[in-house]
Design a protein with these regions (language model features):
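C-terminal motif of bacterial Sec signal peptides marking the signal peptidase cleavage site
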Residues: 14-17
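Serine-dependent acyl-ester chemistry module
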Residues: 19-113, 125-136, 212, 243, ...
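Conserved beta-strand elements of the Class I
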Residues: 225-229, 259, 287
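Short, well-structured alpha-helical segments in soluble
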Residues: 273-282
Length: 332
């Protein structure tokens, strides 16, 4: 029981910050009537572990979410291939020790196998993190995101991944007329002090193109460009720009431009949409997806309707509704 409580506590601290910080991004606020009705009727969002623990119905829904994850990873691969960029999958999570959830244990091998099946290079970076405690690498007990020390450790994990891809290049270019004003979904030109409502102050700096970095990208490019896509693990709340792991990597690779396109709460769906609509115009040579097993559960319909970047309407299957009723009660 103690292990379960620790896991739930860690997950809550990690995702409470995610929900708060979502408001600091520029995401469309278009209202869709059908989607609004679904949000009103089905307001609860179960995490992946709750889905897995819901018996046969939960397993059926989790299998559905896994298929959606696999399909979306394939879509991301195709988008990367279309611009001549190499896509690498990395699994990264601050869940370690007693905080490791059932979804993490089951999700890691699935993601690795799915990536391999698509012919993608993949790295499980959770294994080397297992030697640390949550207090060593995160802001626990206040928050479950990376601490300054944890950010250094994460940067060290990504250093060999980027070094091994030193010669990777893409010849795809775009004209000034084709490029959008921003390549990321954060508000551009920010230099603001935030605390996420947790009294953990940090300075957020974004460039003129909506990425969490201080310098703007110029064209034509003269260096290899590495684009990191992901959620809060990439964005790194509660750390100043100089402390986040992408900035530390930039210091280690001065002949490479490291681009942080992370947005708190973003899913694999969102990352694919961001690449297609904006980020590809930054002309990346290497794209690193930062994912974790909880991203699988993000393909449940209530999560997608509530948080999806696209603001599309995701109509639930009968099995998804059955799970919702099982977890949260009947909806008339």
């Amino acid at each position: 029981m103690r292990k379960l409580l620790l896991a739930v506590s860690f997950f809550s601290l990690l995702h409470a910050g995610c929900e708060e910080k979502k408001t600091e991004t520029t995401v469309s606020a278009d209202v869709n009537q059908e989607r609004e009705e679904l949000l009103k009727t089905y307001s609860q969002v179960p995490d992946a572990s709750a889905i897995l623990q819901a018996g046969d119905t939960g397993k059926a829904v989790y299998d559905l979410c896994k298929q959606r994850y696999a399909d979306q990873l394939n879509a991301l691969k195709k988008e990367a291939e279309a611009i001549g960029a190499k896509l690498i999958v990395t699994i990264l999570s601050p869940e370690i020790g007693e905080s490791v959830t059932k979804s993490t244990r089951e999700g890691i091998p699935f993601i690795m196998e799915t990536a391999a099946g698509l012919g993608l290079e993949a790295y499980d970076l959770t294994t080397p993190l297992a030697g640390y405690t949550a207090k060593q690498i995160t802001q626990m007990p206040l928050d479950g995101h990376w601490s300054a020390e944890g950010s250094k450790i994460v940067a060290a994990l990504y250093q060999p991944v980027i070094a091994a891809a030193k010669g990777v290049t893409s010849s795809k270019t775009y004209t000034d007329a084709e490029r959008p004003a921003t390549f990321g979904d954060l508000d551009p030109n920010q230099d603001v002090a935030l605390d996420g409502g947790k009294n953990i102050p940090y300075q957020l700096v974004t460039n003129s193109q909506g990425l969490r970095m201080k310098t703007a990208l110029v064209f034509p490019k003269t260096k290899q460009r590495v684009l990191l896509l992901g959620d809060s693990q990439v964005y790194s709340p509660f750390l100043d720009n100089d402390q986040i792991f992408t900035s530390l990597l930039q210091q280690q690779f001065p002949d490479t431009e490291i681009m942080n396109a992370g947005v708190i709460g973003y899913t694999l769906d969102d990352c694919t949409g961001l690449l297609t609509e904006k980020a590809k115009y930054s002309e990346p040579d290497l794209i690193i997806l930062v994912t974790n097993p909880n991203d699988i559960g993000d393909f449940y319909f209530t999560q997608r309707n509530r948080m999806a970047r696209s603001k599309k309407t995701f109509t639930p299957t009968s099995t998804e509704i059955a799970l919702y009723q099982q977890l949260f009660g009947e909806k008339k």
